[in-house]
Structures are given as structure tokens and as C-alpha cells.
């Protein structure tokens, strides 16, 4: 990890994280940067936390909490759409507003890349980034993701369609 980046560690979701996950999943401002566009109930999230195997081969996804060195949760990182045959997965990242622009996004992407490479033995990570989300595009490029395609009208925000940039990193 780069010495300029804050120290973080990734950990499994705990029942105590349910309130934070509920706020994240139901934040309508985040719906237009991903595929979620409906609210999640506490019951649904509780069921996910209780029943996820945390085995990426079983669930085809894994979600981890991002903690700083003071053990504060600063965000959430996901590997989803796991494809073991082609050794790739989509990465998703949310850094809480209070912790943005402090290097936590870079640290989280670096840590999840190390996990993907050394534990899951993936060959590639990718992300779909809203073409208007300049901060996320800069972050992924800084972390050696390459823009490989622009997908037209991929996201709909309720008023208009927006393009996404497919960002890929071969690891």
C-alpha cells in the first residue's frame, strides 16, 4: 500500500453494521450510481447479513466493510458478478461522505485488489462508472483501471439516461 494512503482494513459485515447498511442502501442519491433503484427493508438486509456465506464461490459476491485504523467504518466495498471461469468480478465502492477526499477510496481499491489477486486469484476487476462522476473516474484511473468502453444510456435517473464508462484493471 502507498505510504500516502491511510491505513484501512477490510472485514466481514457484522450485525452491528445493519443500521449503516440500511442508510447506504436507501440513500436515493446513491441509486443513480449503481443498479439499485428500490429501497431495502431492514428485514431484507438483516436476512442478507445473517445468511450470506461470505464465500465468493457460493454467493458469487462478497461485501466487506472498510475500516480505518481507529476502527471507524469509512465505507463498503463489493465484489459482485463474480465469474470464476473467466476469473473476474465487478467492484463497487462507497466511501461515506465524512471520509471522502482523504485517500480511503484508493486504500479500499488497493486492498480489494490484493484480496482479489491473492485470495480469489482473479485476473481482472472492472467497474461501471457514471460518465459524469468525475471523482470516481479519477479514482479508478489513479488505481490503474483503464477506460475500455463507453456504454450509452446505461443508467436511468428517473429523468434521463446517462452513459457509463467501463473501467477495467488486469491484475
PLM regions: where:
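A broad detector of the eukaryotic-type serine/threonine protein kinase catalytic domain
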Residues: 29-30, 35, 50, 95-96, ...
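Acyl-donor (CoA/ACP) binding surface of acyl/acetyltransferases
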Residues: 1-9, 13-18, 68-171
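Short, hydrophobic secondary-structure boundary micro-motifs
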Residues: 32-34, 61, 164
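A short, well-structured alpha-helix characteristic of acyl/acetyltransferase catalytic modules
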Residues: 1-47
Amino acid at each position: 500500500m502507498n505510504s500516502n494512503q491511510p491505513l484501512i482494513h477490510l472485514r466481514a459485515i457484522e450485525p452491528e453494521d445493519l443500521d449503516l447498511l440500511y442508510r447506504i442502501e436507501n440513500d436515493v442519491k446513491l441509486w443513480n450510481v449503481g443498479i439499485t433503484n428500490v429501497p431495502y427493508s431492514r428485514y431484507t438486509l438483516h436476512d442478507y447479513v445473517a445468511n450470506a456465506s461470505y464465500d465468493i464461490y457460493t454467493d458469487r459476491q462478497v461485501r466487506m466493510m472498510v475500516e480505518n485504523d481507529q476502527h471507524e467504518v469509512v465505507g463498503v466495498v463489493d465484489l459482485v458478478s463474480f465469474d470464476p471461469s473467466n476469473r473476474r468480478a465487478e467492484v463497487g465502492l462507497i466511501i461515506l461522505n465524512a471520509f471522502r477526499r482523504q485517500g480511503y477510496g484508493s486504500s479500499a481499491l488497493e486492498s480489494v485488489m490484493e484480496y482479489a489477486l491473492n485470495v480469489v486469484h482473479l485476473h481482472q476487476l472492472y467497474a461501471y462508472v457514471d460518465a459524469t462522476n468525475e471523482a470516481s473516474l479519477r479514482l479508478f484511473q489513479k488505481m490503474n483501471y483503464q477506460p475500455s468502453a463507453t456504454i450509452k444510456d446505461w443508467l436511468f435517473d428517473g429523468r434521463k439516461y446517462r452513459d457509463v464508462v467501463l473501467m477495467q484493471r488486469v491484475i
